[in-house]
Amino acid sequence: MDLNKIYEILYLLQDMRSFELYGTVGAVVCCLDSINYLTEDGDLEKTFRTVHNYLDPDGLILFDVNSPYKFREIYGYNSYILEDEIDGCSVYCGWQNSFDEKTGICDFYLTLFSENEDGTFSRCEEEQKEKMYTLEELKGALETCGFEFIGAYSGYGFEAVDEKTERYYIAARAKK
């Protein structure tokens, strides 16, 4: 069954700060802490303005972000070693974090080892960067860009956020 045909979903790969659509939509969903990857000044507002431009009146934006608690306490200057098995092959990840409280930027340094069929391992290194946003900053940017803040939730069950919430799930409505 082709879900794209059932739901008529058009998937596009574009920069979220300046994407273009062929009309308006009822909702925009941005997941996997993609908003945290907006690290330059003005990127957050630019993204929210672009989204607002393509939403129907009263359209929704739904997104998740890593919380300040997660940046400070979970990421911080911590290092992790993770291991898993995928399709019978071992995968190892060395993960180091460097968080700058002044800029709100966290640099992630990942070293991945994945087992090849012959038992040897391939190594891959990756660097990522995310920016911490407070709930107040997100609310302010949404309102500046023409949104009505609906709520922030902790988890998929719409629980209230608290000081130890690791991920905010946020909903806002476009005011037209």
What kind of region is each of these model predictions?
Residues 1-3:
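Short alpha-helix adjacent to the SAM-binding motif of class I
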Residues 5-21:
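Conserved SAM-binding strand-loop segment of SAM-dependent methyltransferases
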Residues 25, 104-106, 163-168:
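A short, glycine/Asx- and small/polar-enriched loop/turn
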Residues 25-43:
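A short SAM/SAH-binding and catalytic strip from SAM-dependent methyltransferases
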Residues 45-60:
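A short glycine-rich, Lys/Arg-flanked "PGG" loop and its adjoining helix->strand segment in the class I
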Residues 61-62, 149:
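A short hydrophobic/small-residue beta-strand
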Residues 62-139:
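SAM-dependent methyltransferase
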Residues 129-176:
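C-terminal lobe and adjacent flexible extensions of AdoMet/dcAdoMet transferase-like proteins
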